[in-house]
Amino acid sequence: MRLVSAGLAALFFFLAAASSAGAACTGATVLFQDNFDNLQPTWGEPNEAMKLDNGQLVVMPAADQYFWQPNTANLYDDVDLCVNMTTVTGVDPEEAKAGLVFWYVDVNNFYAFELAPNGKASVWRRQRGRWLTQVAWQEAKGANRGDGAINELRVTTVGSQAAFYVNGTEFKELTGSPPENGQQVGIFAVSPAKGAATFSFDNFKVTKP
């Protein structure tokens, strides 16, 4: 877990959208799967920014804080990675954001696919401890917005190519720099300066594309 300065209610149609997209990771070989019935130790210990609640991994960074947590179960080569993410309390729909971490090497070197409660998404690279924009913030077609919204996020990596999806609709593709010796994957969240945002994650799944 890393922190850096910087009621779970959902409408029925949000739930339906998430359920219909539940099989997004289409690889035949499941490499890792977590429905968060229990907090697996490969997520680390619960703390003030991350806990298990009602079968969800709940992440709540303090105001103006970044949080990311890789899962240490495996090192992967190519992956098809997906998760259901709920915006519980966004506080600021432009400045709050959450998503998936991939091509993770260490605290200073990884990529993040992020979605904000306003329906915009972006991709960032953290290299040598600095944030580098890979895909600038822009509208993500098919994204559900606001508090209570559930969105299925998906990342596929094949070699140096990565593709990003929101609720089954492709957002962008890019050519990046994957680690030479395998990647970890995980989750990511940011709270705005106005206050602590809360996001929850469920149905985290990694398959072989």
Spell out what each predicted region is.
Residues 36, 202-206:
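Extracellular beta-strand elements of beta-rich domains used
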Residues 61-127:
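Secretory/extracellular carbohydrate-interaction modules
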Residues 129-152:
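Short, aromatic/His-centered strand-loop micro-motif at the edge of beta-sheets
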Residues 48-67:
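Short carbohydrate-recognition loop motifs
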Residues 23-45:
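Extracellular carbohydrate-recognition regions
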Residues 36, 81-83, 146-158, 162-164:
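Short tryptophan-centered beta-strand motifs in secreted/extracellular beta-sheet-rich domains
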Residues 174-202:
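Flexible glycan-contacting loops in extracellular carbohydrate-active proteins
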Residues 6-17:
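Bacterial N-terminal signal peptides
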